[in-house]
Amino acid sequence: STHCISSAASDVYKRQELVRDMGLKETGILVSCSDYHIFYKMRMTRKEAMEHYLSVVRECLEIGVSPRCHLEDITRADIYGYVIPFCLELMKLSKEYQIPIKVRCCDTMGYGVNYAGAVIPRSVQGIIYGLMVHAGVPSEMIEWHGHNDFYKAVSNSTTAWLYGASGVNCSLFGIGERTGNTPLEAMVFEYAQLRGTLDGMDTTVITE
């Protein structure tokens, strides 16, 4: 089981209580990575934010909980100036504690695109490539979390899959804030087209 918290100090204690009381093995941690979020929401410098996030991650690892770091607003972030260095530190901690750390790429504003020649931070494939090749994040530890503000949640999620992300976050019928998230039913058919099989999934239940 898993749950999700912010990286605020008060939530750290809440997480410890939940882990103790519910026996949770994984927790999601919101780690805003764009300057917009770091400066205006967190009211920190990049250095302060990174040190703060890493301290929360380490606290999770100390009690044997696997962190899932939600890189909020990644399509407006400095990928090679902040995101990659941060993820390198995450991988060092993962190796030190021998506990997997997952990385969730959150296209919070729906700005991501999958066009050939698109540059980071807008390029979905560029983000996934950077995390895998330059930060050393294993494919099985990478997720894509898309928003559909510009109606690219499905194509961006599929692109993330194709370039190495092992997971895609979905919601039934795409229900979510603003214009929604990646629809689960759409990704079922994307999966079937890519793999050539539904692997036992029954698509008719969507009408129930």
Feature locations, PLM:
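Small-aliphatic-rich amphipathic alpha-helix that forms the alpha element of a beta-alpha
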Residues: 145-171
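Catalytic-site beta-strand/loop segments enriched in glycine and acidic/polar residues
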Residues: 132-152
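Glycine-rich phosphate-binding active-site loops on the catalytic face of alpha/beta enzymes
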Residues: 31, 163-180
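Alpha/beta enzyme core
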Residues: 14-29, 33-68, 72-137, 163
